[in-house]
């Protein structure tokens, strides 16, 4: 929904496209294949069975971008982050697999990586939001929870004007701390992944955490730095 092509289209057409994606997704999960992309997806589902729900949740997240330009509470933003990013972790964890060391011992229970997978997606999306505050402002969007702006005495008008004051810095310190807490939640699950998947995921986690460090280095000026 963020591409230049998508932004040039009317909301009604974007909504129709998402309806089409939902219909196609349901069809593929039911075994109906119409094109090569469907065939690839069907083959993946056959080899790595999984629930359709994360895919439907992802589409719901895209629908939120058609109507939501503000998020009153963090709970609202967390739901959005789960839908557009946490779902990716649920989609891919079965493909990545779990290290046999955690499943072969007779006393071992197979670990559930779902919570960590969702946490990493939420952490990554929160990081994207913090990095892209200036860009989103230009599109009339504020993803930072309005309850947080109020808590730190920083208004929507302040954000739209790109005001860099102490209230903004205090607000951003709080936001970065929250994002890091979500990264912390995700780290425990990385060690459970299969050897081939562990390092790519760990590298991604470290790179995204590094974006938070970069925001600190520019003194939270995400209006003029990205």
Where do the protein language model's features map onto the residues?
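Catalytic cores of Mg2+-dependent Asp-rich isoprenoid enzymes
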Residues: 2-124, 130, 134-226
């Amino acid at each position: 929904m963020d591409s230049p092509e998508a932004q040039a289209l009317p909301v009604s057409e974007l909504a129709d496209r998402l309806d089409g994606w939902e219909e196609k997704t349901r069809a593929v999960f039911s075994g109906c294949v119409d094109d090569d992309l469907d065939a690839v997806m069907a083959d993946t589902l056959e080899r790595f069975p999984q629930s359709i729900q994360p895919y439907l949740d992802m589409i719901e997240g895209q629908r939120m971008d058609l109507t939501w330009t503000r998020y009153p509470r963090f709970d609202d933003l967390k739901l959005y982050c789960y839908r557009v990013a946490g779902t990716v972790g649920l989609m891919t964890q079965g493909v990545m697999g779990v290290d046999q060391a955690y499943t072969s011992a007779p006393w071992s229970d197979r670990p559930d990586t779902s919570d960590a997978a969702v946490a990493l997606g939420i952490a990554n999306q929160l990081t994207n939001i913090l990095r892209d505050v200036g860009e989103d402002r230009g599109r009339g969007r504020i993803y930072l929870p309005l309850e947080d702006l109020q808590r730190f005495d920083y208004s929507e008008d302040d954000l739209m004007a790109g005001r860099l004051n102490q209230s903004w810095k205090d607000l951003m310190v709080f936001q970065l701390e929250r994002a890091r807490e979500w990264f912390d939640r995700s780290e425990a699950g990385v060690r459970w992944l299969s050897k081939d998947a562990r390092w790519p995921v760990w590298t991604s986690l470290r790179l995204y955490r590094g974006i938070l460090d970069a925001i600190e280095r520019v003194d939270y000026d995400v209006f003029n730095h990205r």
